[in-house]
Amino acid sequence: MKFHSKLQEGIFLKRYKRFFADIEFQGQQVTAHVPNTGSLKSVNNPGQHCLFSESTNPERKLKYTLEMIKSPTGSWVGVNTATPNTVVRETLHHVVGHKKEVIGGFAHWAAFDEVKPEYKISAETRLDFALKKNNSDKMHFIEVKNVTLAEEGTAKFPDAVTERGQKHLRELMALMEQGHTAEIVFTIQRHDCGSFSPADDIDPEYGRLLREAYQKGLRVSPFVLDLTPESVELSETVLPLKM
């Protein structure tokens, strides 16, 4: 995913009312939209460098969007929750159906022939992606989760209690019982982690459900994102699990 123009760099001053951030930029204070409902627990540190995008849409109330904050370890941390789905969608469309060309972390996606985004499984629920083979009525369902939290070199999810995330795990287990396969892609929007674990201290029920689903065959894929001021890409680096 390429940004429309190179991100601007400033100093993160504060986040408030969840969706607003003040940034020092070229000697002035500007306000940016924060596209993240989580706590941003490990990067909500005033004084850190940050990167933000600028919209050319004249109807937007805030023309700036906070995209990344530099962590105390020196890693850029992506905070835009829309980024992971875009990056995974681009990767899937590049990989699916190209069986002979794909190796490594994405190889299991190449076995499928079609990508169906925002796949409706009930009146109330859509999952991020469904992958389909031409000769099968069974699907591979994918739900994408954004990861910003890290503690002692371990990426963790969630950074706040997520009843929606719990619901998705129950639904994925139900789909697996019907003979489908399922996967959660945890997109690690930082480079300073060597493993992934559920954040049991924040949402113990999510951790319990994730382990149950994993034991029942859920594929858990913590992919690291490559973050730069020009683009964000899904790397083939899959972190080891600490379950």
Curated annotation (Swiss-Prot):
One of its GO terms (molecular function) is DNA binding. Coiled coil: none annotated. InterPro entries: SfsA, SfsA_C, SfsA_N. Pfam families: SfsA (PF03749), SfsA_N (PF17746). It comes from the Bacteria. Disulfide bonds: none annotated. NCBIfam families: sfsA. Belongs to the SfsA family. This is Sugar fermentation stimulation protein homolog. It comes from Bdellovibrio bacteriovorus (strain ATCC 15356 / DSM 50701 / NCIMB 9529 / HD100). The lineage of its organism: Bacteria, Pseudomonadati, Bdellovibrionota, Bdellovibrionia, Bdellovibrionales.
